[in-house]
From Swiss-Prot:
Gene Ontology cellular-component terms listed: cytoplasm; plasma membrane
Pathways per UniProt: Pyrimidine metabolism; UMP biosynthesis via de novo pathway; orotate from (S)-dihydroorotate (quinone route): step 1/1
Subcellular location: Cell membrane
Name under which the protein is recorded: Dihydroorotate dehydrogenase (quinone)
Recorded name of the encoding gene: pyrD
PROSITE patterns hit by this protein: DHODEHASE_1, DHODEHASE_2
SUPFAM superfamilies to which the protein is assigned, alphabetical: FMN-linked oxidoreductases
Protein family: Belongs to the dihydroorotate dehydrogenase family. Type 2 subfamily.
Alphabetized UniProt keyword annotations: Cell membrane, Flavoprotein, FMN, Membrane, Oxidoreductase, Pyrimidine biosynthesis
Length: 378
């Protein structure tokens, strides 16, 4: 029985004045408590989660950057910013989890309300503003959870710029966070694409971005995979320029994409509980409205790099078909967040089962053979 869809999803989609951030915080708090507990009850609950949501098949396994991803579906950054539930994500069937975004300085984020669900569009609208306890705090949390460095699934760490740090200090800010965490993550992501930190997206310009990437690579003595997360609102020429920069700086890959600021993708004129016109609201849109453009960006990146630069696809994944379209466009791995909130924790398992069906239908031996298979012809 899917208790999430029976009990929690109706609450999420109801017209009751329930703050989505409150729901998220409490759900995450429960998972964190479960992760910390050593009680027999907690052990039994975690075993139940693994039995209910776990699913693996060797045909879905991917090997990238010296890491093994038993399943290709990961948790996107933004849900577990401070890593407080880090050990739990494998129990829920994820093949990897991306923590953060974290910044060098602890910061509260933007004023509330700052997270909105828009059920009629299967979307979310957020202006969180990188609220987090700091890179050092995340480092302490990860040392506590994984004292021997052994993690059941690959853990990614998403790095952002502190709001109080001027753009001129962005290089040192990113480097500071990386120094705190570089031995504690399996891969790292440079986030210059959130719309919720003033001026951050300007760092996507090649002239601004190259010094940041070069400085991080100079610090990357342990040769951790370093990826870049980009916005869907870049024009194609900008995407191509960034792809070439990523190759020049020997990045491990690109995550496509972050949230969009294109409010024309929504059918509503106001955010829930707000009177201000949507056009005046600051923030980014995730969920189904992002699906098409994120897949277009993935396809463009794959073509531009001739499949030589791995891509993690994210944006509007609510089903196995959504994930499949991103994979055949060029994504080696995919991430979910908004779709996972709407569809519930069984989504990860459902996606994996559906991917196997599509491999069988296409006559392909494994998921690696599907990556980019439709990028050239479409």
């Amino acid at each position: 029985m899917d208790f999430y869809r029976l009990l929690l999803r109706p609450l999420l989609l109801s017209q009751l004045n329930v703050d989505p951030e409150w729901l998220t915080r409490n759900a995450l708090g429960f998972l964190a408590t479960l992760a910390r507990s050593r009680s027999p009850l907690a052990a039994n609950l975690r075993s139940y989660l693994r039995q209910t949501y776990g699913f693996q098949d060797p045909r879905l396994a991917m090997s990238l950057w010296g890491l093994t991803f038993a399943t290709p579906v990961g948790l996107a950054a933004g849900f577990d910013k401070d890593g407080i539930a880090a050990p739990l994500w494998s129990d829920l069937g994820f093949g990897f989890a991306e923590l953060g975004t974290v910044t060098a300085l602890a910061q509260p984020g933007n004023p509330r309300p700052r997270l909105f669900r828009i059920p009629q569009d299967l979307a979310a609208f957020n202006r969180m503003g990188f609220n987090n306890a700091s890179a050092e705090a995340l480092a302490d949390t990860l040392r506590g959870y994984f004292p021997e460095g052994q993690r059941s699934i690959p853990i990614g760490i998403n790095l952002g710029k502190s709001k109080l740090t001027p753009l001129s200090g962005a290089v040192s800010d990113y480097v500071s966070s990386f120094r705190s965490l570089r031995s504690l993550g399996d891969y790292f992501v440079v986030n210059v694409s959130s719309p919720n930190t003033p001026g951050l997206r300007s760092l996507q310009a090649v002239t601004e971005l190259e010094p940041i990437l070069a400085a991080l690579q100079a610090e990357n003595t342990e040769q951790r995979p370093l990826l870049l997360k980009i916005a869907p609102d870049l024009v194609d020429e900008e995407v191509v320029a960034i792809a070439h920069l990523a190759q020049r700086q020997q990045l491990a890959g690109i995550i496509a994409t972050n949230t969009t600021i294109d409010k024309s993708l929504l059918s509503v004129e106001h955010l829930p509980g707000r009177r201000e016109p949507l056009a005046t609201e600051a923030g980014g849109i995730s969920g189904a409205p992002l699906r098409s453009r994120s897949t277009e960006v993935i396809r463009l990146l794959h073509r531009t790099t001739q499949g030589q630069l791995p891509i993690i696809g994210v944006g509007g994944i609510f089903s196995a078909e959504d994930a499949w379209q991103k994979i055949v466009a060029g994504a080696s791995l995919v991430q979910v967040y908004t779709g996972w909130v709407y569809e519930g924790p069984l989504l990860v398992k459902t996606i994996q089962q559906g991917l196997l069906e599509r491999l069988d239908s296409a006559g392909l031996p494994n998921l690696a053979a599907a990556v980019g298979s439709a990028a050239i012809d479409s």
